[in-house]
């Protein structure tokens, strides 16, 4: 005989097996006994074996049935937040890369656009600085696609088993994954570049610039996350995200003048978060600036608001509609992503339930 067969034979002839068999027979007999009129015959008291397996089994069978209740939304959010933060800490290179990129780009832009002048060249350099900044932070949000792609199977399995709802998961991802990587880098970049470039030297203008950069990054992140959740294939989601960014960039206002657009497509600028952010940054910096240019021995002074208007921007727009547009884009894409997180898993769970019934 093999070692496994000898082990089985030894267990079959052991006292532990005999006690276990007797306990199981007693439990089965108690289940078949008639209810109501006479109370069920109590099970015989068994001598506790050395392993204690038989007695522990009986205690488990006679113990009150505890039905596990689903934890509250706050408990789900707290547990998922701890897990999300732990995953972020275990992979510090991603956070360090975002922080280092923001600092390096801030230093490079500070050197390239050092102490801008109040002339036409300085006006052009300000436009270039803001456009490059939005381009950098917008396309850096594409890294969100791989973040959710790595968790898609785990999320689908856990949601199908009803471990947690979609809202706590989305909130934990937004608070402990999106915010550290999308809020801190714009603040670092803006803090470095603002003084080096020589932008408007007021505290209010500085914080307005930081606000616009943060809101733009959040809107871009929400857009990319929404596409990543809605499209299962990472390569397709990456292509759609890139095309969406380019389309929004096309209507930003620098590549195509709004006044030269056909009326049928002019409304598309209102769907461009690049346009809202660029217009807000330009208005915040240049609205009260006067440009002085000396050409052919003649000094010319031009209000920057006039040139802003010639580019198709609204010199009075900042809070409304630009900042409001960024907030609405963030909320709309977040709500759509939450809907994508909820609907497919619920549908899969429903189909699995119907299959099990049949």
Model-derived features: where do they sit?
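Alpha-helical transmembrane segments and their short interhelical loops
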Residues: 110, 166-168, 172, 176-258, ...
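Topological signature of polytopic alpha-helical transporters
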Residues: 1-90, 98-110, 114, 246, ...
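Juxtamembrane membrane-interface segments at transmembrane-helix boundaries in membrane proteins
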Residues: 85-86, 119-133, 201-211, 304-325
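Long, hydrophobic alpha-helical segments
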Residues: 109, 127-147
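A short, hydrophobic C-terminal helix/tail in secreted or cell-surface proteins
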Residues: 352-358
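Interhelical loop segments of eukaryotic multi-pass membrane proteins
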Residues: 117-129, 154-162, 241-244, 266-269, ...
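Short alpha-helical transmembrane interface motifs in multi-pass membrane proteins
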Residues: 66-67, 135-141, 205-209
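Transmembrane helix boundary and interhelical loop/hinge segments in multi-pass membrane proteins
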Residues: 141-162, 166-167
